[in-house]
């Protein structure tokens, strides 16, 4: 299974860092990802570092990346 464009497979997860214009933009992006995650009942690890947001999608029960992670990584990338 291939990682969506812009995403890297790191330590068994799909990871990508997004650089937003401002801290407020970064928080707004995180909120959009949170809404997606809640709607799908599947939640990424999220790190906020000023204007940079790093997302990591993986499935705990599978011990790695699943098709669902690939789908949600792609969808969350569209929210940036």
Language model regions located:
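Preference for bulky hydrophobic residues occupying beta-strand positions
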Residues: 16-18, 46, 55-57
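A short N-terminal helical cap/helix-turn-helix that marks the beginning
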Residues: 3, 37-47, 74-80
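Amphipathic, hydrophobic secondary-structure cores in small proteins
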Residues: 23, 27, 39-53
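N-terminal first-folded block
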Residues: 1-23
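C-terminal structural segments of small proteins and small subunits
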Residues: 51-79
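Solvent-exposed alpha-helix faces
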Residues: 31-32, 74
């Amino acid at each position: 299974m291939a990682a969506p464009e812009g995403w890297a497979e790191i330590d068994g997860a799909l990871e990508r860092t997004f650089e937003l214009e401002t801290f407020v933009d970064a928080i707004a992006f995180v909120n959009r990802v949170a809404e997606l995650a809640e709607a799908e009942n599947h939640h990424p690890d999220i790190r906020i570092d000023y204007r940079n947001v790093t997302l990591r999608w993986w499935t705990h029960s599978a011990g790695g990346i699943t098709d669902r992670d690939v789908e949600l990584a792609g969808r969350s990338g569209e929210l940036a």
